[in-house]
Amino acid sequence: MKFDQVIEIPRPKIDIDETLSNIPRVARFIPGVEEVREMEDGSFEGILKVKVGPMTILLNGRVDVEQNQEAGDWVLKAKAQDKRIGGGASSTITAKVKQLDSGNTELAIASDIQLMGRLGELGQPLIKRKAVEMIEGFAQNLKASFE
């Protein structure tokens, strides 16, 4: 499943870049993130707890982050499992940060998410609704962090 979202943030690009580069902090802007820790190899491990329809999903996973801060490009590749329900997810999230003439910053997020096992059996409309809700929650929390 693919999702695209564009967020305009009333801050200069340098502020957004600085915030996004603090992965443990910015990860907590995602609704349901319970824990994030940086590993020795520069990747991150964490826990995401989210209710989708009748199921509460507890994903334990790893995220690899590639960034070209000068160009404003970020790529996050994640894989996670919920061993209790026998399912998992993998995703690639691309973010592009761009300074606007107004002085605001545009953050364009493209997400490609694959679900496996029992998670893959959930209906796409249900999953899409939850994914959009989480992206919107992230955007609200990111904006609120500058207030």
Task: Show which residues each predicted segment covers.
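Hydrophobic pocket/interface hotspot
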Residues: 16-20, 26, 65, 109, ...
